[in-house]
Amino acid sequence: MDECAPKARRNGRDARRAARQGPLPDAQRPIRPGMMGGRFLPLSEADVLAIHRTALRLLSEVGLADATPTGLQYLTSVGCTISEHGRVLFPESLVEDTLAKAARHFPLYAQDPKFDLEPWGKKVYYGTAGAAVNMVDAKGAYRESNLQDLYDIGRIVDCMENIHYFQRSVVPRDLPDPFEMDFNTCYASVSSTTKHVGSSWVHPDHLKASLAMLHKIAGSEAKWRERPFVSQSNCFVVPPMKFATDACNCLELAVQEGMPVLLLSAGQAGATAPAALAGALAQEVAECLAGLVYVNAIKPGAPAIFGTWCFVSDLRTGAMSGGSPEQALLSAAAGQMAHFYDLTGGTASGMTDAKIADGQSGAEKGINHALVGNAGANLIYEAAGMHASLLGFSLESLVIDNDIIGMSLRTIKGIEVNEERLSFDVIKDVCLNGPGHYLGSGQTLELMQTEYLYPNLGDRSPPTQWAEQGSKDIIQRAEIKVQDLLATHFPSHISEEVDAEIRAHFPVKLPRENMRAK
């Protein structure tokens, strides 16, 4: 039995409703993973070219500082030079040549192939991310996040049909040792879901241990390289325009070992990037193009995600404002720049500044998700569960945001216009021969599931019925859903034999009994 599936009800109307809520083939669903965006274009063609040219100038005239010794070797071997200021300069011709040979149309694999992603063109996928240091409960109380929280988040993501991949969302603050934190972050993530996983590491040795574990789960190193189901989120730059030493060392190993990398530049407009939105975008495009050259110098054609995460400051305080309209515009524009290069693009959306799942949270997430998704951004990170400008994570918001993402996906699909959908004959029949309404028409019943999207948590009942059922708000309904999933859904895709072997060789800190139903 699928623990994620809604429980069937036995009485007539509820049984019919449950049947309608059953899974449809992807081709018939009103929404599905990888829907085609691209209708919203915040930048004109001239704007895109201007940003591209500015990025090339920044790389060739300003360059990046603080390259590692091995990074210098890789970059100078393909044509980079060193300026009088000791910065790595990237000739325009080198950047253009790299763009011509960079990896395109590469899948992001999952442990279960049905969750494989095809993030190219203008296909849209929403997923989690972040390094929140707190959990927020249904009452709004904050506490430090731990390893069990990370595992529980992944278990819920595993059941959320509109959350298409799971990138590490919280920091296990109960693990002070950096090696144990990195290893267990990866272990808990891949154990909690069969969807594609993203994680990060602070030292190459930590990554080596995780790779050994991933080889065991895959069956062998060769099988891992055929279908790498974990990608590395790598903040290889410290904006503005500097390399990050530890991250670059991990980047080199990941590329060599066949792990896809998210080249993540997260400059904050008004703080670590220009306050002018166009300038912030140009800087981040330049930084990610530098990362692309770096990756291809290590291994030509290695899979790399163009990760322009343009963050925004509230200029009154200097603090990050992840739920702002400027954030929506920058992330949408970042997706548009990735289309210009025909690269798999990753950007961020859903980073509300609200501390709890309130009206502010819904408004900020809704406008950001709708704009960024309709811009056709391929991989939309931070999309579910986040609060307080990435400082907090809520399980209740995770399931609420699954609904918000679903609504955004429905706007991406748009309105299908053809002879049948224009409905001339249906209108004529109802007006001339029928009852004067469409409630029971064949077309209405046929399109009920394929044309219309219904919320999982959103309430559409009349006020009297809502009151009779306890007047629950969406947070209360989400809390019930979360507790039900946590009590019933324990993924078992990694065999007990493989798990025991992993535990025999590595310091797994997640108790096995916490990974089984009580």
Predicted features and spans:
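N-terminal small/glycine-rich loop or linker at the start of catalytic domains
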Residues: 27-31, 47-49, 54-56, 118-139, ...
